[in-house]
Amino acid sequence: MCGIVGYIGTCQAAPVLLDGLSKLEYRGYDSAGIAVYDGNKIQMQKAMGRLKVLEEMTQNGATLPGTVGIGHTRWATHGAPSDLNAHPHFNKDHSIVVVHNGIIENYLKLKKKLMSKGYEFLSETDTEVIAHMLDYYYNGDPLATITKVMHRMEGSYALGILFRDHPDEVYAVRKDSPLIVGTSKSGNLIASDVPAVLKYTRDVYFLENEEIVKLTRDGLHFYNIDEEELQKEPTHIEWDMNAAEKGGYEHFMLKEMHEQPKAVKDTLTPRIKNGDVVIEELGMTDEEIRAISKIFIVACGSAYHTGVTAKYIFEKLARIPVEVDLASEFRYRDPILPENTLVVIVSQSGETADTLAALRLAKEKGVRTLGIVNVVGSSIAREADNVMYTWAGPEIAVATTKAYSTQLIAQYLLAMKFAKVRGTVSQNDFDAMIQSLERLPEQISLLLSHKENVQRFANRYLAAEHVFFIGRGIDYAISMEGSLKLKEISYIHSEAYAAGELKHGTISLIEDGRLVVAVLTQPEFYKKTISNIQEVKTRGAFVMAVTTVGNTEVEKVADYVVYLPETNPIFANSLAIIPLQLFGYYVSIGRGLHVLVS
């Protein structure tokens, strides 16, 4: 999740840019850079590492004269962290410079076209493609050029752009990636988020999708993609700086839960093309996919729970046997890895010690490895044979939410890809699954919009000492993650059990008033899990059920029911986890444990 700032006004730009970037450090980054027009040319400084490196290089901006500029903190998506891959990026003669937050899905196609026209690339980024595209179409009119490029780019982006021959203008663009505009007596600003501008103004404009703004020293001009001028009204921000960093949410965990629809979409959309699953980074031919005889999924914590879900889906769709291992166990048990085995390593950071050790063990044994990670250039990303990135952005809260959700998406896509290549899924079923996946971001948003209902229920159980989660099949995997969320942020003892195992000892722990959370998203298990609910009700338990809309039978036995939008049952985890995340969050803050979700 990159940070963008831009400024034009009466003050020296570089110190303003550096100050704004410092207010966006909470978003996470691996490099930083700024570009300033000094009255003659555009000067640029950028460096890998903390913002402090850039501040020292420029003497806190003093070495870069000029009152117009743009800046950027980068969270790597295309290309590892490096000075060359850091933003801003120039065109060939340094007359156009760009900063970018987002993902250009068709950048390889655009890059190939530009290279055929003689353009040379210095970095591995998708952003450099934008700079050269602007150069290719530039006709002296920045607005017309920007709209031409917008029509040809696919994906999400927020852009800040300088044109050397328009020295008194800064341009900014938004499509599916946030960007705000601020106005003050000393100048006008753009930024990815409110904290970057609060020192200068509390009056901001929120750009909508496919809108463009031209900033001058005297004013702002807004346009749509058809170059029609728009009238917009500012919003006055009342938040303090701490609240602004959290986007107006009380805690980072709540903010990150609300970022899940976008994170899921960002991970999903680039890999669905023309109704098919396209995983270019997989690095496996169809013949190699068909040759895979066994899959191991190795991870820790919440990532392990996504692997448990993926096991059910891989085996159901692709008919490949799958083992799921905790990395801390896998690395020490001398696992038997037959020829034609694929080991999938899942980690948000790409640096989890046990998971990294498991990867190295798999490589020592000579089997193919695939990393599913969130951090570009991390150890697992570098050492795995191939890597599939989740585009969750940085997580600040203790408990993972959006990284978990994007890891699920990556593994759904992987299972579907394998099933399609191996011929174990019909075209009709495959098409229906694509449609279900594409609806998930909107459905997650809908569930988040009803968070107050979960909060009211959570407030009734703040004094709970023991909570049990139950489910069958994929629902058991969901229960494991729901239980972990509750215990790690509320300090309440919580356990997840396969519902069919209750009778083997666990039922003796169910007492009058004990809270049981039952997950029922798999139609083939509805009756059996309802029977399990009846068992715990007989012993005096209070039951919260999470189920799919239409399963009204559960109302007869559960005390409280959360209904999920209809989806393909194999993807239900992505929806069922939302109320369980919210439940853990609201119990935690209700018990005064704000530090664990901040």
Regions of interest found by a model, annotated:
Residues 67, 71-84, 273-286, 310-346, ...:
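Glycine-rich oxoanion-binding loops at beta->alpha junctions
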